[in-house]
Amino acid sequence: MKRAGGILLPISSIPSKYGIGAFSKEAYEFVDQLVEAGQSYWQILPLGPTSYGDSPYQSFSTFAGNPYFIDLEALIEEGVLTKEECDACDFGDDPCSVDYGKIYNERFELLYKAYERSKVYEDPEFQKFVKENAFWLDDYALFMAVKKRFDGAAWNEWAEDIRLRWGFALDYYRENCYFEIEFYKYLQFKFLQQWTKLKGYANEKGIKLIGDIPIYVAFDSADAWANPQLFQFDGENLPVAVAGCPPDAFSATGQLWGNPLYRWDYHKQTDYEWWTRRMEHCYKLYDVVRIDHFRGFDEYYSIPFGAETAMAGQWEKGPGMDLFWTLERKLGRREVIAEDLGLMTPSVEKLVADSGYPNMKVLEFAFQPDEDTGYLPHDYDRNCVVYTGTHDNDTLLSWFRTLEDDQKEFLFEYLGKEVSEEEVNWEIITLAMMSCANLCIIPLQDYLELGNEARINMPSTLGCNWKWRLKEEQITDKLLKEIKKLTLRSFRTERPKVEKEPEEAVVTEEEKEE
């Protein structure tokens, strides 16, 4: 990974008149702005269809895409929707926040109209897509259609015959939900078609896409329902244990995530076939993949199913390098960012080092006066990615406002001067950009100097996350020039070559006489 810079901006945050960011002209304009600012990477959040809580890290499928991101204007141009139909919908009235309730109610009704008018079954490209993606698409489309029949209930609350995937029940729902199944396939076809076009445009402009995947799948997902053998389930396809984190300084009872845990012994027996397919699919969508909770491949925290807190959990061994050697053998060497934040042990550090993948450094974690965090720039080596913060952090400005006095003093000492709220963002961004880290990713909110209102996610909370939206006028020509200036100064983009004037030839006296 060469020395470069990039910006973190979720697709959902892109400006749009239809309530949520999409693969629309505004997304293409953002690519152009990245180029103008001298950037090389655009990092996004997971693209999967979101469920209760709207978190992209709790998706109905690890392979499918979020229908919310389908560009409605492109469907208008295709003639399967009208502008009047789209404009008549209530997607919410706050241009700075996504109203997921209204998006859900309005979007799917529009998309179903588009599907009914599309004659997609006559499109050979659709037939090709269905065939090439059958290994996940068939189960996902059936899962979503059946979920709708059960009023959105989680699959463990469905009737026993379909919950346990009895043959006659599968046949029954495939026949009786045929049009709904085809609808969900159509959505995935349009999603991939539009995303591939946007990614191609970005790549042509020299912008690489950094995707993001959680290590675990959601329990209420097509992955868990259709492939129970991959997970630590009992005979009723209920979890034996679930994922989380142990008690620490931030939580006396730990974190109970509830994701099903993998049966790593089974994955190894299959030569990690499911993981191979998962990563192969990722590299059709992204140029680089950030894997969340990378330490879980070394050791994972296992909590008995039904426990009310994470206190009863214990550490279990993960697959380690065996998984990554297998992936490299089958897929070749690919670009990965290892998210190794949080509790680190020598064995986790060894796994990251052995993998050769760049790990992460976050400056908001750095300024602890009585602690050697490892996140200060003088501790970096080149093979890492530095961030001011991630989607789980507060914005830089809001973080600064909440620092304790001793933390501020330490920050000022490290910077070599005191800085005000008006100065702190660019001072810390400069610290990140000037570091030796090969890649520097800055959340757009930090360049915009926004406060807590622009925070993407507050971990362990529900209802107020994943909502922030950018307004078009917030990205100005002046801002792009300032970003480009800093990117040039930090040697994170190609610097213009200075043309030297040719030197005049010096003629000696002897040459003159000749």
Regions found by a protein language model. Name each.
Residues 30, 198, 348:
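Aromatic/hydrophobic pocket-lining residues that form π-stacking "cages" and hydrophobic walls in ligand
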Residues 1-80:
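Trp/Phe/Arg-rich N-terminal binding region typifying the photolyase-homology
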Residues 184, 188-217:
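Conserved, well-ordered alpha-helix/loop/beta-strand core segments that scaffold catalytic motifs
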Residues 449-504, 509:
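Structured C-terminal cap/extension of enzyme domains
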Residues 3, 35, 160, 203-205:
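Acidic, mature catalytic/reactive cores of soluble proteins
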Residues 39-46, 208-214, 284-296:
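Short acidic catalytic loops
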Residues 35, 195-203, 328, 352-353:
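Surface-exposed amphipathic alpha-helices with a cationic face
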Residues 10, 16, 54-192, 217-441, ...:
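Alpha-amylase-like alpha-glycosidases and glucanotransferases acting on alpha-linked glucans and related
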